[in-house]
Amino acid sequence: MVRAGDSLYTIAWEVGLDYRDVAFWNSLEPPYRLEVGQELFLGGDLSRPQGQSVTRAIVEPESVPLVTEDTAVQTQTTETSTSTAPTQATGAWIWPAKGELISRFDPDGGSNGIDIAGSDGSPVRAAAKGKVVYAGTGLRGYGLLIIIKHDETFLSAYAHNRAVTINEGDPVHGGQVIAEMGQSGADTVRLHFEIRRDGQPVDPLSYLPRL
């Protein structure tokens, strides 16, 4: 059942499905608007919208701290990314934050991405160009989360932020500051970063440039 703060992308993300499949099974069309209390089918034969509804434990959304334009500009000018922004032609990925890699991709161990330790308030950057499809706190365990849709295949997620500098629907370019690192939903300051390909988690280190 859809709850306040849910979106098609967060629901699909939580259960490990491709958002396009969830949209198809439920006859949803862009921009995929959901109603609170709506029941969604989350599995079944791809040839028709059938399956079983799933009851999920979703935290109620909190207000999203938004950094002011002046603060965002100041952050961008005082911090320099370790990688250059990708061109539209190459579509390359870049590291989303500076810091120490403290956790690697280990889906069997419960980690669908990597964790980068850093300082509170340090910039978090879009790993590639795309569009912000979610910014909020509605997904348990991720704190203040941003999800970016890069194309029909790839999504990326940036979790545990202190504040965001973008809004849902905003286009972003690779290297653009999208948030401030924090520890919302975590015990220490870190960025949890994930990449999903066709709805499935993949190892970000297979896509990011080698350090």
Question: Positions of the model-derived regions?
Answer:
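Extracytoplasmic low-complexity/disordered linkers and repeat tracts associated with LysM-containing
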Residues: 1-147, 151, 163, 167-177, ...
